[in-house]
Amino acid sequence: MSTVEPNAYDPQQVETSAQQFWDATRAFQVDENSDKPKFYCLSMLPYPSGALHMGHVRNYTISDVVSRYKRMTGHNVLQPMGWDAFGLPAENAAIKNKTAPAKWTYANIEHMRAQLKSLGYAIDWSREFATCTPDYYVHEQRMFTRLMRKGLAYRRNAVVNWDPIDQTVLANEQVIDGRGWRSGALVEKREIPQWFLRITDYAQELLDGLDQLDGWPDSVKTMQRNWIGRSEGLEIQFDVRDTTGAALDPLRVFTTRPDTLMGVTFVSIAAEHPLAQHAAKSNPELASMLETLKHGGVSEAELETQEKRGMATGLTAVHPISGEEVPVWVANFVLMGYGTGAVMAVPGHDQRDFEFANKYGLPIVQVVKLREPRNDDEQAWDATQWRDWYTDKSRELELINSAEFDGLDYHGAFEALAERFERKGQGQRRINYRLRDWGVSRQRYWGCPIPVIYCAKCGAVPVPEDQLPVVLPENVEFAGTGSPIKTDPTWRQTTCPECGGPAERETDTFDTFMESSWYVARYTSPNARDMVDRRANYWMPADLYVGGIEHAILHLMYFRFYHKLMRDARLVDSDEPVTNLLTQGMVIAETFYRDADNGGKDWINPADVEIQRDERGRVVGASLIADGQPVHIGGTEKMSKSKNNGVDPQAMVAKYGADTVRLFSMFAAPPEQSLEWNEAGVDGMARFMRRLWVQVHKHVGEGIDDELTKIVALGGPLSAEQKAIRRKTHETIGKVDDDYGRRHSFNTAIAAVMELSNALAKFDDASAQGRAVRQEALEAMVLLLNPITPHASHALWQVLGRGETLLENVPFPQVDAAALVRDALTLAIQVNGKLRGTIEVAADAAREQIEALALAEPNAAKFLDGLSVRKIIIVPGKIVNIVAG
């Protein structure tokens, strides 16, 4: 029996002891040789930034709770962990700290692994890997060479953000107000060769597959559907003429609104379009404009918000119906990477075209009207004022100013135009996707080398598989003004594997989404010689994936796509990588600041602030602890370095213990909602942990023996109070089981256990039967909390006389249906549907007895005075409704 004093809950001692037991017994290592049903649960792997933040803690605690619960319900559970270790932050840190990215990364992994272990997660560490190691990325290099041979990987020119000072490509998020984040130089749009994967070949399958993902949030599936962006329309040919009237290569444009074709008053093309380049040769002013348009970012979001700019090229396009010539303009909101790089401009019914036409004085024509306008605003049409109905095709529309197509609705016009263009060879029906092929080239150093060799004679040649991996040199000096491998001739220069002549290696590296697109499968067989082995089909698809909704599009789309590539390579059997997805909310915290001399804000960490709150816990005042002077209250925002409102998990674990931190992170909010960090709430969880500790030790102090655990089942009749505690215990078991297993509602599970604890605190029956009832309740509480507070549960199980064991191997408590049966029921009494009182009846009371008691209930009788009872409706166990008149 434990010798720990009742008031001596020492989280550090308890947690160290439990973790040592788990490590010594290799408690969470699993294999495939089990007759239990498998359950594969994981969180999105972390980037080794150097320290965990509270978002990590919440994420990994959610998956750990589910993993431990599933072990207790008889599953063979895999919960692995690894490191998404390539990427830009390591390069930035290398510049700042004057160290190699590899050294910085590996040091961070060591530190963060220790942090994760301190939180007691049930992780199979034997499967750990870092994606920056050659024995990991060799497999994606091999896959890439196979995709090259199948035509699913290809190279073409693409527009990127180019920093002319640092001589490097910038990610969209590194372009701030059109300038490089580090150099401050005006960013240029530059066209360079890049490698792509043909995700568009899988667009329809990716779209259709969403219908099978019943365990994914609808919000994520909607975002993916919108990103794939399937649309049906027409591809229409516009003949093009130069200033002399000579014919040039025709333009082909795709439109989902062929009904607005007669409203085309100009055609827009991208600055990089061959026709724009052709026109600029004889037009210096246009050439200057094209040079200007090279500056600024290339992200879709930036294009949507930037000022519309453009210039006439001098070229004209021939309208395919009217034969009229309309001008061809260069416009900065048209990109070569989207569609054909050309757009038919209908300013009367497209807002971007409308804004552009008004700016440059181009004609605007109405060609569609609403058949049933709801108000005067919808009846009027104004070429100077945009209204949303101009582009609304969800309403009943009618074509006007459209020659022989007048009077047709959208569908009629679509069919008529499609038939005409297909008959004349001027166009065709097409299904188009917003989704674009995945550009996987990055002009950065710290990434997986792309396994391609360039030969003057043979062109781009995949590195032979027996020469893989192409290893990234790690011991480099990194200054940030270019990639070390680009300037290292001993690494770059090689021999062509086909002709034996001199050749050079590709110096671009893979987009880091490549590594995170297949790691879930690698966990299943981390030591396999190929990408995965047969063990993958035992574990895949994963049963639960936990991560932020911010990954809904890019990571989760590439993740699904790459899994299909692996399936088609016969590496896995499943169509999708994950069956169920849980997207946890952000961790938010209060912010405080003082006005800075430069007009900005100096953000102050909440730990450095003395906070005054009202009776509802709202912040009503704040001052800096250091000087006692007031600080501004900035509101509640996502924890971030920029707002300096982060909380160090390590400090919280040191102060309160891992179990308390885990408990608060699960109790403060449902998983899908934002969690507001509140240390007063953490204090509350710490008090509950101490109270539970005392409850168990006080009970044990009264003495326990082997027979005590059997008395409930074997003993005589229970008193009403004993029955009430047993009923509460088993009601709690049923609720927590449902909250963990079906609803993932961990906060309500904790609340239910707290209610049981409160009820037990009022139960002071010292009889053998009473102590047996208490023993059963305490054992249930310890087991119910084990997924969330595993260290304390490990210790308290021993205190309760059950010995030291892995609680995940102890079956999750089961509801005893007999314990839920009530001797008496409380029924609500309604008179004509309104609540008038309650009555207590025996659980097996006859209908006649219930009716008599209901009619005699004093308050109900008062409202029945002078009325005749027409009907009595009894809802068993709940309500008696007396209908009178």
Swiss-Prot record:
The keyword Nucleotide-binding applies. PROSITE patterns: AA_TRNA_LIGASE_I (PS00178). GO terms for cellular component: cytosol. ATP binds at residue 641. A motif ('HIGH' region) lies at residues 46-56. Pfam families: Anticodon_1, tRNA-synt_1, tRNA-synt_1_2, tRNA-synt_1g. NCBIfam families: leuS_bact. Belongs to the class-I aminoacyl-tRNA synthetase family. HAMAP family: Leu_tRNA_synth_B (MF_00049_B). This is Leucine--tRNA ligase. It comes from Xanthomonas campestris pv. campestris (strain B100).
